[in-house]
Amino acid sequence: MPTPTPKKVTEIPTIDVVLVVAATESAAYALDTASEIAVEPQVEEEEAVRLVVKGKLKAQKQKVSTITGNQITLTDNVFSPELVQMLQGGTIKYWQEAGQETEGTEDKGFGVSSYTPPTVGSGIHGSVFTLRAYSAQYDTSGQIVRYECIEYPNCQGVPVAFASEDGAFRAPEYTINSAPKSDEAPYKITYVSTLPSVS
C-alpha cells in the first residue's frame, strides 16, 4: 500500500498565562496574576499481559491507559480570597464603610476584612467549577493574533496552605482536581479573538 503524501501540520505557538477564569453557575472570578499552570493527567493503568513459553514470547496484550481527569497546579502571584473560597469553602468578610470598623458579608467596595476557612471536621468543601486558562498566540511581528482557551470541567480544589519567606512576595500554589463526567472530554481547547470582559 502506498504511503500518503505528508501534509504539513497546523502550527499554533502560544505563550504566557494571560488570564484564568474559575466559574460556577452563580459566580465567575478572573485572575490575571497567575504565572504558571501545570497539568498532570490522572491515569488508571491495566498492566500488560504476556504469554512467554520456554523463554519465547508467544502473545501479548498491550498495557491499557485510561485517563480519569487532570490534576492542575495553579501558581498565582497574589492572594485571591474569592478563589480560595471557591476552592475550599469558608467565609469572606468585607469592610462595610471607608473607616473600616464594621465587617459584613456584602462587598460594598471597601475591601476584604477577613477570610476564614471551614472549621476542622465540618465536612464543608469548595464549589464545583469550570476552569478556563487563556494563553496568547503571537505572529512573527510580535502582535497577539488570538487566544487559546483550555477548559477543564468539574473542578474541585483541595485545602490550601500558605508559606512566606523574607524578601519574597508570596506565590500561592493551588491544587485543583478536574474529573469529567461520563462521555465528557477531560479538557477542550478553543481559539478566540478576544478575552472575556472582566468587571
Show the residue positions of the predicted features.
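Solvent-exposed edge beta-strands and adjacent loop segments
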Residues: 2-89, 154-168
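Extracellular-facing segments of soluble proteins and assemblies that are Gly/Ser/Thr-biased and enriched
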Residues: 65-132
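Acidic Ser/Thr/Pro-rich low-complexity disordered segments
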Residues: 25-29, 134-146, 191-195
